[in-house]
A protein has these predicted regions:
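Short beta-strand
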Residues: 75-77, 117-121
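Short acidic (Asp/Glu) and glycine-rich catalytic loops that position anionic groups and cofactors
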Residues: 82-84, 119-123
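Charged, alpha-helical interface segments at or near domain boundaries
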Residues: 1-93
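Short amphipathic alpha-helix segments
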Residues: 95-109
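Short amphipathic beta-strand starts and helix->beta connectors
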Residues: 71, 107-115
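Hydrophobic, Leu/Ile/Phe/Ala-enriched alpha-helical segments that form helix-helix packing faces
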Residues: 60, 64, 68, 104-108, ...
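C-terminal structured domains
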Residues: 112, 122-171
Length: 171
Protein backbone atom coordinates (compact mmCIF):
# COMPACT_ATOMS: atom_id res chain seq x y z
CA UNK A 1 0.00 0.00 0.00
CA UNK A 2 1.34 3.43 -0.88
CA UNK A 3 1.38 6.34 1.52
CA UNK A 4 -0.73 8.42 -0.91
CA UNK A 5 -3.58 5.95 -0.60
CA UNK A 6 -3.80 6.32 3.17
CA UNK A 7 -2.87 9.97 3.68
CA UNK A 8 -6.42 11.29 3.80
CA UNK A 9 -7.45 8.59 6.29
CA UNK A 10 -4.48 9.00 8.60
CA UNK A 11 -5.67 10.05 12.07
CA UNK A 12 -3.79 10.93 15.21
CA UNK A 13 -4.72 9.13 18.38
CA UNK A 14 -3.60 8.80 21.97
CA UNK A 15 -3.02 5.29 23.23
CA UNK A 16 -1.96 3.95 26.59
CA UNK A 17 1.78 3.57 26.67
CA UNK A 18 2.58 -0.13 26.77
CA UNK A 19 6.31 0.14 27.28
CA UNK A 20 7.33 2.84 29.74
CA UNK A 21 10.44 4.10 27.96
CA UNK A 22 9.94 7.79 28.52
CA UNK A 23 7.83 7.73 31.68
CA UNK A 24 5.05 9.65 29.90
CA UNK A 25 1.45 8.78 30.70
CA UNK A 26 0.36 8.62 27.07
CA UNK A 27 2.07 8.63 23.73
CA UNK A 28 0.84 10.01 20.45
CA UNK A 29 0.58 7.49 17.66
CA UNK A 30 -1.16 7.34 14.32
CA UNK A 31 -3.67 5.00 12.82
CA UNK A 32 -5.89 4.77 9.81
CA UNK A 33 -9.43 3.43 9.61
CA UNK A 34 -10.41 0.68 7.18
CA UNK A 35 -14.20 0.60 7.19
CA UNK A 36 -14.82 -1.02 10.60
CA UNK A 37 -11.26 -1.78 11.64
CA UNK A 38 -8.28 0.34 12.61
CA UNK A 39 -4.65 -0.38 11.91
CA UNK A 40 -1.80 1.23 13.82
CA UNK A 41 1.18 2.35 11.80
CA UNK A 42 4.41 0.51 12.54
CA UNK A 43 7.66 2.46 12.48
CA UNK A 44 8.87 0.16 9.69
CA UNK A 45 6.29 1.81 7.42
CA UNK A 46 7.91 5.21 8.00
CA UNK A 47 11.11 3.99 6.34
CA UNK A 48 9.24 2.24 3.52
CA UNK A 49 7.34 5.43 2.77
CA UNK A 50 10.38 7.66 3.31
CA UNK A 51 8.52 9.69 5.95
CA UNK A 52 9.49 10.94 9.38
CA UNK A 53 7.46 10.75 12.57
CA UNK A 54 6.90 14.50 12.15
CA UNK A 55 5.46 14.00 8.63
CA UNK A 56 3.01 11.38 9.88
CA UNK A 57 2.08 13.43 12.96
CA UNK A 58 1.50 16.62 10.96
CA UNK A 59 -0.78 14.88 8.47
CA UNK A 60 -2.65 13.02 11.20
CA UNK A 61 -3.27 16.24 13.15
CA UNK A 62 -4.49 18.02 9.98
CA UNK A 63 -6.96 15.18 9.40
CA UNK A 64 -8.07 15.24 13.05
CA UNK A 65 -8.70 18.99 12.78
CA UNK A 66 -10.87 18.43 9.69
CA UNK A 67 -12.75 15.63 11.44
CA UNK A 68 -13.34 17.86 14.47
CA UNK A 69 -14.48 21.09 12.79
CA UNK A 70 -18.14 20.70 13.66
CA UNK A 71 -18.68 18.96 16.96
CA UNK A 72 -21.27 19.14 19.65
CA UNK A 73 -20.13 19.43 23.24
CA UNK A 74 -21.98 18.99 26.50
CA UNK A 75 -21.36 21.58 29.18
CA UNK A 76 -22.05 21.91 32.89
CA UNK A 77 -22.33 25.20 34.74
CA UNK A 78 -21.49 26.10 38.30
CA UNK A 79 -23.91 27.86 40.66
CA UNK A 80 -22.89 31.26 39.24
CA UNK A 81 -23.76 30.16 35.70
CA UNK A 82 -20.16 29.88 34.51
CA UNK A 83 -19.23 26.89 32.38
CA UNK A 84 -17.14 24.61 34.59
CA UNK A 85 -16.98 21.45 32.45
CA UNK A 86 -16.92 20.71 28.72
CA UNK A 87 -17.40 17.10 27.61
CA UNK A 88 -16.42 16.02 24.11
CA UNK A 89 -17.72 12.56 23.33
CA UNK A 90 -18.45 12.00 19.65
CA UNK A 91 -17.93 8.22 20.08
CA UNK A 92 -15.82 8.07 16.93
CA UNK A 93 -12.70 6.67 18.60
CA UNK A 94 -10.89 10.03 18.50
CA UNK A 95 -12.31 11.89 21.50
CA UNK A 96 -9.20 11.51 23.69
CA UNK A 97 -7.06 12.44 20.69
CA UNK A 98 -8.79 15.79 20.48
CA UNK A 99 -6.53 16.83 23.36
CA UNK A 100 -3.95 17.26 20.56
CA UNK A 101 -6.04 19.79 18.61
CA UNK A 102 -3.93 22.91 18.09
CA UNK A 103 -6.86 25.25 18.84
CA UNK A 104 -8.21 23.43 21.92
CA UNK A 105 -6.84 25.96 24.40
CA UNK A 106 -7.93 28.93 22.32
CA UNK A 107 -11.46 27.60 21.86
CA UNK A 108 -12.12 26.49 25.45
CA UNK A 109 -10.16 28.99 27.56
CA UNK A 110 -12.79 31.67 26.93
CA UNK A 111 -15.25 29.42 28.84
CA UNK A 112 -12.95 27.63 31.31
CA UNK A 113 -10.25 30.30 31.86
CA UNK A 114 -6.57 29.57 31.38
CA UNK A 115 -4.98 27.26 32.15
CA UNK A 116 -7.62 24.53 32.38
CA UNK A 117 -7.53 20.83 33.19
CA UNK A 118 -8.19 17.97 30.77
CA UNK A 119 -8.81 14.29 31.41
CA UNK A 120 -8.74 11.39 28.95
CA UNK A 121 -9.54 8.27 30.99
CA UNK A 122 -10.51 6.32 27.87
CA UNK A 123 -10.57 6.68 24.11
CA UNK A 124 -14.17 7.87 23.87
CA UNK A 125 -14.14 11.00 26.04
CA UNK A 126 -12.30 14.26 26.56
CA UNK A 127 -13.20 16.16 29.72
CA UNK A 128 -12.03 19.76 30.06
CA UNK A 129 -12.73 21.68 33.25
CA UNK A 130 -11.78 24.69 35.32
CA UNK A 131 -8.47 24.64 37.14
CA UNK A 132 -9.86 25.26 40.62
CA UNK A 133 -9.42 23.02 43.65
CA UNK A 134 -13.13 22.28 44.11
CA UNK A 135 -13.71 21.19 40.50
CA UNK A 136 -10.51 19.12 40.38
CA UNK A 137 -11.37 17.38 43.69
CA UNK A 138 -14.91 16.69 42.52
CA UNK A 139 -13.98 15.26 39.11
CA UNK A 140 -10.71 13.40 39.87
CA UNK A 141 -12.39 10.36 41.47
CA UNK A 142 -14.75 9.99 38.50
CA UNK A 143 -11.83 10.18 36.06
CA UNK A 144 -10.00 7.46 38.01
CA UNK A 145 -13.15 5.30 38.11
CA UNK A 146 -13.76 5.70 34.37
CA UNK A 147 -10.14 4.76 33.70
CA UNK A 148 -10.49 1.54 35.73
CA UNK A 149 -13.96 0.63 34.48
CA UNK A 150 -14.13 1.58 30.80
CA UNK A 151 -12.57 -0.16 27.79
CA UNK A 152 -9.86 1.49 25.67
CA UNK A 153 -8.12 3.08 28.66
CA UNK A 154 -5.75 5.96 28.06
CA UNK A 155 -4.73 7.50 31.42
CA UNK A 156 -6.09 8.61 34.77
CA UNK A 157 -3.41 11.33 34.88
CA UNK A 158 -4.97 14.78 34.67
CA UNK A 159 -3.42 17.18 32.16
CA UNK A 160 -3.03 20.94 32.29
CA UNK A 161 -3.77 22.80 29.06
CA UNK A 162 -1.97 26.12 28.58
CA UNK A 163 -1.34 28.40 25.58
CA UNK A 164 2.01 26.59 25.23
CA UNK A 165 0.56 23.07 25.12
CA UNK A 166 -0.38 20.15 27.34
CA UNK A 167 1.53 18.74 30.32
CA UNK A 168 0.79 16.39 33.23
CA UNK A 169 -1.11 18.16 36.00
CA UNK A 170 0.69 18.24 39.33
CA UNK A 171 -1.78 19.66 41.79
Amino acid sequence: MSVDSIYERLQSCLAAQRVAESGAAVEPTARWPFDRTISYIARTHFDEWNLTVEDIHETAIENLVKRSEEMAANVAQDEEGRISLVVLSQRDGYDASRLLLPTLHERLSEHLASPFIAAIPHRDILLCFRNDAETVQRLSPQVAEDYRRMPHQVTEQLMIVTPDGVAPYVG
